[in-house]
């Protein structure tokens, strides 16, 4: 497939009618040594990253990212692709909330964080989540 971004809306039958595509995924079903070429190339605005994973591995990326599948020159590339609607529509807020959640998880493992400080950070995270869920 040539370079493109995925459509914003997935039009399908119930229960998926008018589903917003926030995240795209590619599940690799063939091992990299079974075909030549066929890399999923994702462009982040400055650089392209080529991805070709083992069978059973999945990559998830923003549906608005420019991406393409490079030409398969030998063998057969077998993948399952799909789209996910996030509770958080704004991609920047989705990234911020994910980063915050990961950091809270790291802090939770430390012994020297007062419980009251951790609880306040967790409250702020959940308030942001509530404000941005759709």
What are these regions (language model features)?
Residues 55-59, 78, 120-123, 128-129, ...:
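Long, contiguous binding/interaction regions
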